Every structure is written in structure tokens, then in C-alpha cells.
């Protein structure tokens, strides 16, 4: 019994610190003077090497934004992470995207298939191809209501997210995110979770 995987959640530097860094009120450089993305990659390389000696898989959770072509302000850069861990898990929750992001004119959370498919096809798949040995992509999906009382996330929205990812070529699995971890709510999605995509 037990688990054969260690998942590093929020493997990043603090966000919203740009002004402090710019004004030299905070310095995140380590003793090796590595940039943030380098420091994260070095840590994950070390952790992966050590945990592999014990027969343990290593996964890392990253923001959906990290699949873009730039290094994020908090140091996450998809190619640097996918190159050193066994599993990478982006968090592209549809309610985290702005209304005009990716050219959509209606709120992204109302179009879970389109947003997940676009993100997967146009960003993740391209970043995965930039390295020789990319990790398996197992994406976090949104299992909570984006705006309580306004829009409900049920089986249809869960299915659309999973299908959008699969149609983009991301077939390494998914994990539903619901901060309350309410098992009764998860049961409502069992049809979506058990469907073949």
C-alpha cells in the first residue's frame, strides 16, 4: 500500500513581486545566481534524481500560463519543467482566462471545450515538442462553479474539458480540482469521469 509518486504543487516563486524586485527591495537569486526558471529546474532535477533512486515518480503542478512562450514572473517555464519530471500538470481552469484571451468573445468558463482545446493545441503541444524527453501531461480540470449562482459546472462542462484536452492530443489523464474535496460533488461527475474519449 502507499503511493509511488511525489507531486510538487505550486513549484514556483511568489507572484505579484515584480515591483519589489524592480525596486531592488527583494532578491530571489540563490548562491548560484540562477534565474528563477533555472532554480526551479535545478531543484526538480535534484528531487527527481533522488526520488528515482527510490523507485518514485515525480510530478509538478504549474499554472496554465507557463505553457506560453515566455518565462513567467514566478519562474515557471514549461520546457524547463517538462524536461526533468515524469508528469507535468498544468492548471488551465477556464474561469482563470480573461474574456478576450485567445480571441474568445464570451467568458471562457462558458466554453470549456474551446478554451482547453486551444490551450492544449496551441501552447502545451508546442512546448512539449521543444524538448527531447517531455513529461506525461496530466492536466488539472475545473470541477467547481466559476461564479456561484451564475453558471453551474456539471457533467457537460467536465466532459467538454476532458474532450478538449484529448482532441488537442493531451491524453495523459486529468485531475479534477475542487477546493472543498466534496466527495458527493465528485460523484455527480462520475459519468464524465468514466466516459471513453
Name what the model sees in each region.
Residues 7, 14, 35-75, 116, ...:
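Aromatic-lined carbohydrate-recognition surfaces of secreted/lumenal glycan-active proteins
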Residues 3, 85-99, 109-197:
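Substrate-binding cleft of secreted/luminal carbohydrate-active enzymes
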Residues 1-6, 48, 73-84, 124-129:
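Short amphipathic alpha-helices and their capping/turn segments at secondary-structure boundaries
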Residues 5-33:
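Active-site-proximal loop/short-helix segments
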Residues 24-26, 76-78, 106-108, 192-194:
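Short, hinge-like loop/turn segments at secondary-structure boundaries
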Residues 41-44, 48, 78, 82-85, ...:
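Extracytoplasmic/secreted envelope proteins and their assembly/folding machinery
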Residues 29-39, 105-112, 147-149:
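The substrate-binding groove and active-site-proximal loops of carbohydrate-active enzymes
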Residues 19-21, 100-104:
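Short acidic, glycine/proline-rich loop/turn micro-motifs
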Amino acid at each position: 500500500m502507499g503511493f509511488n509518486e511525489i507531486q510538487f504543487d505550486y513549484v514556483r516563486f511568489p507572484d505579484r513581486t515584480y515591483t519589489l524586485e524592480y525596486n531592488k527591495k527583494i532578491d530571489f537569486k540563490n548562491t548560484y545566481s540562477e534565474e528563477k526558471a533555472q532554480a526551479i529546474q535545478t531543484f526538480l532535477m535534484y528531487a527527481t534524481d533522488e526520488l528515482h533512486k527510490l523507485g518514485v515518480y515525480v510530478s509538478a503542478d504549474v499554472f496554465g500560463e507557463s505553457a506560453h512562450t515566455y518565462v513567467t514572473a514566478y519562474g515557471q517555464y514549461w520546457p524547463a519543467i517538462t524536461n526533468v519530471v515524469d508528469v507535468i500538470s498544468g492548471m488551465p481552469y477556464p474561469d482563470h482566462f480573461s474574456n478576450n484571451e485567445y480571441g474568445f468573445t464570451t467568458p471562457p468558463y462558458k466554453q470549456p471545450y474551446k478554451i482547453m482545446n486551444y490551450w492544449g493545441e496551441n501552447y502545451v503541444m508546442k512546448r512539449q515538442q521543444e524538448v527531447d524527453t517531455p513529461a506525461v501531461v496530466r492536466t488539472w480540470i475545473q470541477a467547481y462553479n466559476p461564479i456561484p449562482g451564475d453558471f453551474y459546472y456539471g457533467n457537460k462542462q467536465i466532459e467538454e474539458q476532458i474532450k478538449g484536452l484529448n482532441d488537442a492530443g493531451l491524453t495523459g489523464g486529468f485531475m479534477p480540482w475542487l477546493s472543498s474535496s466534496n466527495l458527493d460533488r465528485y460523484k455527480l461527475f462520475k459519468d464524465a469521469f468514466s466516459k471513453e474519449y
